[in-house]
């Protein structure tokens, strides 16, 4: 967990002015943590690879996904679904099988898969009720964009109380769009205002707070802000409105930017050795059953990574996977 938290902090501080050398160090720490059973590190590593930040081979992607599945972590099914949908990670493109994996991931509780399946089932001639259930499950787990989609759907079906609750979940997850709907909803729109009417009593103070919170969420959307304390700031009626000092915990922590403990070199060495990994890269050593034999002929290290051995290095085009 020490490696994961430090890598996540480094990743947070490498979002804007991206340094590939830092990305390589982050991937190294995530790899070692993931191979030692830290599923969040595995998820962050694979998500980073999907976004082009970390370099993972097809073999690594499939192996890490299978490790998640074996550990009963639904994200493993979700990653396999993505690879099947796009014909990636050495898998043949198979949209039908991809849908099965998305549904399996959703049924096992993965919020991204629940949002995906919810979108597929949303049309009125398919399964809108199941879609709303899927989206609600995803929203309750903090899936940001799905909350506003659910809220709009419920609002348009005149389920105003449920819509308001969905938007509140969206604000908690960091969705500025949801905050905007609640801001307008508490501003007293007329019933004929089909866009913003939520059957709420006009409450200027609640509207002001949602506006202020929404501005922060929009400004920092790229950093994935969250407001888990939203019900302590703007609880939904009939709960009374408490005092609020205008502060958000996420923003305070973001601005403070306090680094977690730096992983000790001895700890990294110990964890790497336990799983037969190269501590310099986090990749399996030749003695490991997970070592990719063709990696020696194909690629020893990637741009930004420390070289695992001294000597002259020849640049090479990365082969198609």
Regions inferred by a protein language model and the residue ranges of each:
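Short helix-capping/linker turns of helical repeat alpha-solenoids
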Residues: 36-40, 45, 52, 71-77, ...
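Canonical positions in the second alpha-helix
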Residues: 32-33, 66-68, 104-105, 135-138, ...
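N-terminal leader/linker segments that initiate helical-solenoid repeat arrays
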Residues: 1-25, 36
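Long C-terminal extensions of eukaryotic subunits of large macromolecular complexes
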Residues: 234-293
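Structural signature of tandem alpha-helical TPR/SEL1-like repeats
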Residues: 18-28, 53-64, 90-101, 124-134, ...
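Residue at a conserved register position within TPR or TPR-like alpha-solenoid repeats
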Residues: 10, 17, 49-52, 84, ...
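TPR/TPR-like (Sel1-like) alpha-helical repeat modules
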Residues: 164-176, 183-220
């Amino acid at each position: 967990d020490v490696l994961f938290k430090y890598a996540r902090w480094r990743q947070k501080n490498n979002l804007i002015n991206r340094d590939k050398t830092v990305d390589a160090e982050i991937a190294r720490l995530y790899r070692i943590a993931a191979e030692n059973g830290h599923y969040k590190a595995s998820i962050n590593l694979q998500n980073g690879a999907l976004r082009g930040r970390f370099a993972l081979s097809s073999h690594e992607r499939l192996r890490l996904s299978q490790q998640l599945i074996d550990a009963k972590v639904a994200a493993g099914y979700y990653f396999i679904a993505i690879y099947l949908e796009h014909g990636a990670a050495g898998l043949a493109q198979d949209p039908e099988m991809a849908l099965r994996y998305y549904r399996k991931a959703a049924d096992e509780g993965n919020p991204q898969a629940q949002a995906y399946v919810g979108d597929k089932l949303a049309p009125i001639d398919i399964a809108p009720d199941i879609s709303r259930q899927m989206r609600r499950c995803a929203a309750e787990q903090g899936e940001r964009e799905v909350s506003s989609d659910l809220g709009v759907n419920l609002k348009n079906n005149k389920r105003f109380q449920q819509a308001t609750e969905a938007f509140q979940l969206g604000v908690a997850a960091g969705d500025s769009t949801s905050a905007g709907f609640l801001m307008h909803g508490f501003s007293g729109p007329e019933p004929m205002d089909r866009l913003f009417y939520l059957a709420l009593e006009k409450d200027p103070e609640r509207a002001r707070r949602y506006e202020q919170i929404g501005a922060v969420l929009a400004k920092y959307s790229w950093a994935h802000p969250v407001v888990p304390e939203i019900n302590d700031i703007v609880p939904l009626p009939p709960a009374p409105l408490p005092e609020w000092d205008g502060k958000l915990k996420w923003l305070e922590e973001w601005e403070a930017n306090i680094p977690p403990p730096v992983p000790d070199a001895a700890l990294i060495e110990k964890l790497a050795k336990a799983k037969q990994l190269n501590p310099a890269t986090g990749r399996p050593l030749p003695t490991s059953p997970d070592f990719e034999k063709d990696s020696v002929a194909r690629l020893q290290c990637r741009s930004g990574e420390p070289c695992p051995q001294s000597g002259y290095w020849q640049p090479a085009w990365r082969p198609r996977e």
